[in-house]
């Protein structure tokens, strides 16, 4: 099974081997490193192996008596917090320290403003870094800041570029002042020139000077996608707050319109996110050597209400990792090393004993503002909580699970917006399909595997997808057998066949604005209470492994775009497939060219083998679009003539017309077997079986394909207004 997994995910395996791969015999001794840890077999360099300043007692950072040198650490010092000592940072220092190694406890004062500038801050397995706690967060009247210095990476000591940032093997706790909520929906449309935002609930912890982000909510035309795209998201600043009204320092530059029904009634409004926190981790020079945070092995991480600004070093685009020769000497210094993200859980199994809150790592209420690739990355790390975070201005994706092993993590109520990317529309990309830039299409959320809980999240303004659940070539993966399992030990894992497994939960998520598809889905499972609006290509792109249920989806398009025949957005697009089982129940789709569209091309019919029964069922839907439902059914090839391999049933669904210009070559219809079918297809097609048309009991019939097919395909030649195809009762 493991062999199958490695073969199926060859690109990621090769990339990680290059980034973290084993060092040849003898090379490990060339420099001082930690013992091997999972995912970093060569160990992590001891950046402070030869400290110039060491703590000799517990005490304040500002007290010379705390230090071996009898002076406070200064420019270029290498600082070690010795085991058994608790040192409290109580200063604002602009001295650039080379490194800090924490073997004991390093705490930041919570009642006074603090700042440390350092090249590497490494928390050892028995060390502890604390910047506020749940019981005593950093006071809202002060700030605590760690600035990662812009220093060149030591190519001899650190050829795979783990350094320049925060490297965590021990306990890391950061609790800034609480902001509630971290993002929320507006109560009125924010239009260009407005100097006040009206929100739908009170805010707590927000204050003048805070930075807010507002997504681009347009439904893009075909000509506005890709290289032509110019984002209209905005970052603004609070001037004052009075109740639910937020005054801005400067007026808005753009309209940020909401979604409307086919009748023009305003139904859904955009969100705003607050990206200001009073605990700040940032790069000193975003244009230089940027910092990153990486948590590994048994790191016990709890970050709440922390601002992560201009962090992450891996860039969207082709990866270029460092190479070493058989002696461990550096052959090539990579220019775009994998695995250096703003926040990165890398094979972080968490503490052996589960923390009191039940999660092996916790990210709550944080803000990521600016990353050259991914914002929050979970890689072979499990049982975590990612909640109430705002991730803005990333490249590739905002929130990510990296290799598909990630399991039992809860992604709850996060807001990811403005994720730039390649714009490649590759719904089944994974690592193999998007080579050599995995997760680079531009997604708010990009989940490599199915084994997580995804609920109450919002994605906006992403180049490709709001949510990308990319199956690709993933097959069998090893997942933890229990909480706290070390998945580098085979005995502590169990296999998961991802082609059979269902996504654990995908409910109450929303995607909108300046994106091609709200959700790109590549797994089994159930999508519940999804809202998508102003997606330019599809609301939901479904390429299910075998079985998919879509319950209570709401999709809204900008009807004005349909004035152009070039624009062809679909509410739900079920890609070419054969043996799949798909149920769409209680859908409400308005303002699109097609409500539900599903093609079928004989030449591709075996491209996605599956274990379903080949059916599409639509039940109790409401459709007000140019075409309500267009499904291309099919029979098998002549050797199996008569056995349907793709069928469609529409039950108790309501269809209404949409007042937009008519294309005489493709007339509007409630249900169509003719709309954009493959011309000249010689095989007969199974009919669409309709019962309770327009929710009227007894109005039952079948719709047969009537165009570009041999004479005699349909058993009848009746027609009916609003139906594209022959109608038989």
Segments the model singles out, each with a brief description of its role:
Residues 1-11:
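Bacterial N-terminal signal peptides that target proteins for export
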């Amino acid at each position: 099974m493991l062999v199958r997994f490695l073969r199926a995910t060859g690109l990621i395996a090769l990339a990680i081997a290059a980034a973290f791969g084993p060092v040849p015999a003898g090379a490990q001794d060339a420099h001082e490193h930690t013992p091997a840890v999972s995912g970093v077999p060569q160990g992590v360099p001891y950046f402070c192996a030869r400290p110039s300043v060491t703590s000799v007692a517990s005490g304040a950072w500002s007290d010379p008596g705390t230090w071996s040198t009898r002076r406070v650490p200064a420019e270029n010092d290498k600082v070690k917090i010795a085991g058994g000592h608790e040192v409290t940072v109580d200063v604002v220092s602009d001295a650039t320290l080379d490194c800090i190694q924490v073997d004991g406890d390093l705490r930041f004062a919570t009642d006074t403003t603090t700042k440390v500038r350092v090249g590497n801050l490494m928390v050892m397995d028995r060390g502890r870094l604390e910047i506020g706690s749940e019981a005593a967060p950093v006071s809202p009247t002060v700030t605590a800041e760690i600035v990662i210095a812009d220093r060149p990476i030591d190519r001899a000591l650190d050829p795979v570029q783990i350094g320049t940032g925060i490297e965590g093997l021990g306990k890391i706790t950061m609790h800034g002042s609480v902001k509630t909520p971290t993002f929320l929906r507006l109560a009125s449309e924010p239009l260009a020139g407005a100097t006040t935002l009206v929100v739908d609930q009170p805010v707590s912890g927000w204050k003048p000077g805070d930075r807010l982000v507002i997504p681009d909510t347009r439904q893009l035309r075909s000509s506005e996608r890709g290289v032509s795209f110019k984002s209209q998201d905005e970052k603004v600043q609070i001037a004052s707050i009075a109740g639910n009204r937020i005054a801005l320092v400067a007026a808005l530059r753009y309209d940020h319109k909401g979604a409307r029904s086919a009748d023009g009634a305003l139904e859904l409004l955009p969100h705003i996110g607050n990206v200001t926190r009073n605990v700040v981790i940032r790069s000193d020079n975003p244009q230089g050597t940027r910092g990153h945070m990486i948590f590994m092995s048994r790191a016990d991480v709890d970050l709440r209400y922390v601002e992560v600004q201009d962090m992450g070093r891996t860039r969207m685009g082709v990866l270029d990792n460092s190479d070493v020769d058989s002696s461990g000497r550096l052959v090539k210094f990579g220019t775009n090393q994998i695995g250096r993200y703003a926040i990165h859980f890398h094979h972080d199994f968490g503490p052996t004993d589960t923390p009191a809150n039940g999660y092996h790592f916790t990210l709550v209420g944080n803000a990521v503002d600016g990353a050259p690739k991914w914002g929050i990355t979970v890689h072979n790390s499990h049982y975590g909580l990612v909640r109430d975070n705002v991730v803005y201005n990333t490249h590739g994706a905002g929130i990510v699970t990296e290799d598909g092993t990630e399991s039992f993590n809860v992604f709850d109520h996060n807001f990811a917006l403005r994720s730039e990317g390649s714009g490649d529309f590759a719904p089944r990309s994974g690592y193999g399909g998007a080579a050599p830039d995995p997760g680079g299409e531009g997604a708010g959320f990009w989940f490599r595997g199915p084994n997580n809980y995804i609920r109450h999240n919002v994605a906006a303004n992403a180049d490709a997808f709001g949510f990308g659940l990319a199956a690709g070539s993933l097959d069998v993966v090893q997942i933890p057998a229990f909480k706290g399992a070390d998945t580098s030990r085979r005995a502590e894992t169990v296999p998961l066949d991802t082609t059979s497994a269902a996504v654990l939960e995908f409910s109450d998520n929303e995607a909108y604005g300046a994106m091609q598809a709200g959700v790109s889905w590549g797994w089994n499972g159930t999508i519940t209470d999804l809202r998508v609006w102003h997606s330019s290509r599809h609301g939901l792109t479904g390429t299910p492994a075998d079985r998919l249920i879509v319950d209570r989806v709401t999709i809204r398009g900008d009807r004005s775009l349909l004035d152009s025949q070039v624009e062809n957005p679909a509410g739900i697009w079920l890609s070419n497939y054969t043996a799949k089982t798909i149920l769409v129940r209680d859908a409400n789709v308005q303002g699109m060219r097609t409500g539900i569209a599903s093609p079928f091309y004989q030449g591709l019919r075996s491209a996605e083998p599956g274990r379903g029964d080949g059916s599409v069922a639509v039940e109790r839907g409401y459709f007000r679009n140019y075409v309500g439902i267009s499904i291309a059914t099919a029979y098998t090839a002549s050797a199996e003539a008569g056995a349907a391999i793709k069928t469609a049933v529409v039950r108790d669904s309501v269809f209404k017309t949409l007042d937009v210009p008519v294309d005489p070559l493709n007339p509007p219809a409630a249900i169509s077997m003719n709309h954009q079918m493959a011309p000249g297809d010689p095989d007969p097609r199974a009919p669409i079986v309709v019962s309770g048309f327009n929710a009227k009991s007894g109005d039952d019939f079948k719709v047969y394909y009537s165009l570009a097919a041999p004479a005699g395909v349909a058993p009848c030649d009746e027609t009916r207004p609003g139906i594209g195809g022959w109608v038989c009762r």
